[in-house]
Amino acid sequence: MRSHYCGDLRASHDGETVELCGWVSRRRDHGGVIFLDLRDRNGLVQVVFDPDTVDAFALADKVRSEYVVRLSGRVRMRDESVRNNKMATGDIEVLGKELTILNEAETPPFELDAHSAAGEEVRLKYRYMDLRRPDVLKNFQFRSRLTHVVRAFLEGEGFMDVETPILTRATPEGARDYLVPSRTHPGSFFALPQSPQLFKQLLMVAGFDRYYQIAKCFRDEDLRADRQPEFTQIDLEASFVEEEDIMGITERMVRSVFKELLSVDLPDFPRMPFSEAMQRFGSDKPDLRIALELIDIADLLAGVDFKVFSGPANDPKGRVAAMRVPGGCSLSRKDIDGYTKFVSIYGAKGLAYIKVNDLAAGAEGLQSPILKFLTEDAIKGILERTGAETGDLIFFGADKAKIVNEALGALRVKVGHDLNLVEGEWAPLWVVDFPMFEEDEGQYHALHHPFTMPSCSAEELKSNPGEALSRAYDMVLNGTELGGGSIRIHSPAMQRTVFEALGISDEEAEEKFGFLLDGLKYGAPPHGGLAFGLDRMVMLMTGCESIRDVIAFPKTQTAACTMTNAPSPVDNKQLREVGVQVRKEEG
């Protein structure tokens, strides 16, 4: 039906007759001449109809925004005075000769330009219209190019693209599963996979050596901002590898993606132990573009009478930390109150601070409600250890270590952006040496997942599980976890030891993971892998603010689709066929 895409026409096509199809982006009537801006996937071109082409002119007079048309005409150069440098096709226009209206369109529910003020709710309800907007469309063109580069790279590294099941069995991987009732096995359920983890490990047992997949994953998580119940991973696994092998392959892959799509040469990927990341930045995914750091000062405050500080300072599970903000004296009382409210989200009971108005003036040059509770030596020690200078502000966190890390870690990022303290565009790193487990109310939980190989022997793991480190590694970029992976357990005995540390009995392990344990008995090779969040990678690289901007048909923050009204009730006949009865909520 067409010879060219609208957005592909250039001065080199001058004089050619072309056939175009697309949507009418705008119609203008200028003194008896009608101009149509015709849009397709590749861009926009101006088409001119004059009264000499009687039939086509009459139809052009009828068309309105978003009508679908087909036309033919001759490409010609625009007069220099009316050329549009803001359009890729701005040097030329098409003199229309024939026009066919393929479909009419109602008035769109919102403007389809980049400056549309439409809210997200209406945009998601009419998502197919929202996707017509050029600034939205370009995100998906970028995403398509990214997956193409990834596939080409991994194929070149000897990885095979293998699809794993979508209907599988429920296995505890951290979040709740989406369950699918089986009609042919009444009372039994499939689960949608949270990841291809166990299947890709079994592909290594099968001898596939190198596997990858652009995999759809599902997690029925509690509602959180910018999380999606279904998301896409770049998933890979390889046999006969150690950490350096997987990290090397994936680092080269990410470098290749950035080079080909953004013409960016990423800086070095430093390695940082988990413990150092938490100590310095309060986060296991620190944004290294922000120079602010958390500095331990518990030893300086353990003896003060101020229990807010001395309590956590003397608590083995507590932490007292300071964060120096260069130029922070400019923050107003209102600003500080706002930050105090912000850290309360993370459980902090308050936010102490000291303003260093004049370092040379000693105590007279400091401003803070807490100065009266601190000794002269403590104040001097804090100023020296933080490297405070005139004009700086020091924030403090004192509580359980988890609360201090989360509160000051989040505050560090917020203050860094608010005060324009972000330096550089890209700051990647590897976080390594993660704890094997985290403890909650006396129960151990896998920090990553229970199939991660520990760095120690089975005997050492049994004797001191709380101190065990794992052979896990996370790739972090600008404070976002791009991907996480590990060397996996390939020994049935070690796998049972880890299950035991997690409180999973032999019976439960056999019932839930028997197929994996069986597979490990038949010559499982050493293997490891990593999974990247494709959606987040695209979001970061395109500069989008929300992950929903890079998913074609995303769910809302309440895990619903306003376009299709999913999830929705189903009729009783369908429920009976799968043996499900819906319990009505009481009250």
Swiss-Prot record:
Alphabetized SUPFAM superfamilies for the sequence: Class II aaRS and biotin synthetases (SSF55681), GAD domain-like (SSF55261), Nucleic acid-binding proteins (SSF50249)
Binding-site list for ATP: R219, D220, E221, Q228, E481, G533, L534, D535, R536
Residues involved in L-aspartate binding: E173, R219, H448, R488
Family: Belongs to the class-II aminoacyl-tRNA synthetase family. Type 1 subfamily.
Keyword Cell wall biogenesis/degradation in record: no
Keyword Aminoacyl-tRNA synthetase included in the entry's annotation: yes
Subunit structure: Homodimer.
Record's subcellular location: Cytoplasm
Annotated CDD domains: AspRS_core, EcAspRS_like_N
InterPro entries, alphabetized: Aa-tRNA-synt_II, aa-tRNA-synth_II, aa-tRNA-synth_II/BPL/LPL, Asp-tRNA-ligase_1, Asp-tRNA-ligase_1_N, Asp/Asn-tRNA-synth_IIb, AspRS_core, GAD-like_sf
Role this protein plays: Aspartyl-tRNA synthetase with relaxed tRNA specificity since it is able to aspartylate not only its cognate tRNA(Asp) but also tRNA(Asn). Reaction proceeds in two steps: L-aspartate is first activated by ATP to form Asp-AMP and then transferred to the acceptor end of tRNA(Asp/Asn).
Reaction catalyzed: tRNA(Asx) + L-aspartate + ATP = L-aspartyl-tRNA(Asx) + AMP + diphosphate
An annotated Gene Ontology molecular function: aspartate-tRNA ligase activity
Natural source organism: Alcanivorax borkumensis (strain ATCC 700651 / DSM 11573 / NCIMB 13689 / SK2)
GO cellular component: cytoplasm
Gene3D superfamilies found in the cross-reference section: Bira Bifunctional Protein, Domain 2, GAD-like domain, Nucleic acid-binding proteins
Protein name per Swiss-Prot or TrEMBL: Aspartate--tRNA(Asp/Asn) ligase
EC number: 6.1.1.23
Residues with site note (Important for tRNA non-discrimination): H30
GO term, biological process aspect, one: aspartyl-tRNA aminoacylation
Primary site of residence: cytoplasm
Chain segments carrying region Aspartate: 197-200
